[in-house]
Amino acid sequence: AASRPRLAVASDAICALVATTVTIVVSAFVVPLAIKSVVLASLIILVPGMSLTNAVREISSQHLVSGMARMGGAMSTLLKLTFGTIAATQLCAAVGITARDFALPALPTWTDYPALLVAAIAFAILFRAARRDWPVVILAVMVGFLATRWGGAISGSLPGAPVGVFLGGLLLGALANVYARFAHRPGAVIREPGILLLVPGSVGFRSVSFLLERDTTLSLDTGLLLITLLVSLVAGLMFGDLLVSPRRSL
């Protein structure tokens, strides 16, 4: 796609088509797989969760033109990914390849923490952070994830996911400004990698997928959850800026 501009427009749909086809074939002939989970895991790097979050942040800051443009781009990416997934499913069914979506047992809870460490290192590579910033990026990812999980656990009668995401965004926003104030480095070094595990890109992908599968009730429910999580995360970041304001604008 980098060397073929015309291919770049359809790259998201092609990636989804290939990933879904490979998953269905492997599940049908090699080993049973939880197809939806495997497809989502393979496409998660392309799901525009960060773009959706940035769009809501810009709209809430009254940058309406750039915010709506970013929102439109994110929605078009979601539609292309969903189209590729559904097209692959229909093509496999047309040639007689069908695979049941197996419900595999969940991994033990302790596996979350080694996976979190691996994800934090991967995010440092993904953001092309300088070597000196790697410890900060890794710590930010861990803090954001753990704050969100623990915030949801102590939410009581309140909805766990929105409360956890709000507290995670609040803590990361405040820590990013503290880092910018005292280390004289951009607060984005903490903020952007830290919220990457909090952005609801997978929720948006599932909402559009349910809609194209004509499951409108589940699509609407998931879409409302997407909006709730986006608002909670952006509100947390805004209140973090109010809690600790950066002394320097970097």
Model-derived features: positions:
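Alpha-helical transmembrane segments and their membrane-interface boundaries
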Residues: 1-199, 207-250
